[in-house]
Amino acid sequence: MKFPIYLDYAATTPVEFEVMKEMMNYLTLEGEFGNPASRSHKFGWKAEEAVDIARNQIAELIHADSREIIFTSGATESNNLAIKGIAEFYKKKGNHIITCSTEHKATLDTCRYLENKGFDITYLNPLQNGTINIYELQEKIQKNTILVSIMHVNNEIGVIQDIHKISKICQSNNILFHVDAAQSIGKININLKQLKIDLMSFSAHKIYGPKGIGGLYIRRKPRVRLSAQIHGGGHEKGMRSGTLPVHQIVGMGIAYKIAKIKINSDFNYIKHLRNRLWNGIKNIEEIHLNSNFENTVPHILNVSFNYVEGESLIMALKNLAVSSGSACTSSSLEASYVLRSLGLKDELAHSSIRFSLGRFTTKEEIDYTIQLIHQSINRLRNLSPLWEMFKSGVDMNNVNWTHN
């Protein structure tokens, strides 16, 4: 085994060897390093051809038309382009947008930005299992609602939203529907020919492709319009200017091609490992499962260990690469806003650990992780006066704490 063991695949993934190998062919003088916008010579033609092939590979994974794929720098930019772009283009039609309080910061902060610009944003609170209340969504729709933006799979707890039902509600009310699919693409099957989704954000680095490249699906029929957020040479049909990074796009295409082949085998393999991990730790006293197995991807297992501080546990698990929440917010010492939205008390939210598994995780790594968790929890709790009080029968909910 190689240490530390990587169990943070929801943050990013290692690049597949085949992806890296193909990317190298588009970087140096010996390869096809041209600008795809250079249409007057072979270097540009070859680069453009490579981009077209990758665009098709991406479209095939999600069953879309390749002309509906726009390249961006990643899912964060795609979310910004989708939400701001729709808000600006359709502002004469309405200024109301609906999203969920457990969305990724790329969506929440974009919506807060629009609030400061005069837009009306409704933040749905999730049910206890993390899904949105479909009936509440219907109730919150107004005459001036122009967009609903909901993530497919939550990045902290792995819950899967019913985007099929949501899309039907949006379609029946003539409202555009945007989906953040950064955590679902390549993990569960998505067929955009069957789903009435208007915009979908995704990236490469969550499914064994390079960082710094992503995409936005924009439906052609019926046509969805949006305002560009980056202006310049009019690349990507005028929706996202900037010279295309051919090597990254090629890498993304290969990663999506591999994902199409391995999606089902990956799912079953990772589910087996997730179950092995949970079965190995579920009998630990005062452990709380924050990921509902019935409606989540197996790639993410979020648990809380009561009377153990999450940051302390992460330091104790120094041979494991895990996180206490989203990689984008794990530097904050505040309790996870996602877990608090589910109704968890701060104590449990603070003691949460996200284990995220991937294609290269092994059974031996899971078994080592189980052993290390048991040892670390026992050691930390033996040092905790709160654990001692709990074991002595003190009702912790009735303790009157004095704050200095």
Swiss-Prot record:
Residues where [2Fe-2S] cluster binds: 328
Binding site residues for pyridoxal 5'-phosphate: 75-76, 155, 183, 203-205, 243
UniProt cross-references to InterPro entries, sorted A to Z: Aminotrans_V_dom (IPR000192), Aminotrans_V_PyrdxlP_BS (IPR020578), Cys_deSase_IscS (IPR010240), Cysteine_dSase (IPR016454), PyrdxlP-dep_Trfase (IPR015424), PyrdxlP-dep_Trfase_major (IPR015421), PyrdxlP-dep_Trfase_small (IPR015422)
EC code(s) of this entry: 2.8.1.7
Cofactor entry: pyridoxal 5'-phosphate
Domain of life: Bacteria
Self-association and partners: Homodimer. Forms a heterotetramer with IscU, interacts with other sulfur acceptors.
Alphabetized HAMAP family for the sequence: Cys_desulf_IscS
Family per similarity comment: Belongs to the class-V pyridoxal-phosphate-dependent aminotransferase family. NifS/IscS subfamily.
Protein's UniProt name: Cysteine desulfurase IscS
Organism in which the protein naturally occurs: Buchnera aphidicola subsp. Baizongia pistaciae (strain Bp)
Source organism phylogeny: Bacteria, Pseudomonadati, Pseudomonadota, Gammaproteobacteria, Enterobacterales
Protein encoded by which gene: iscS
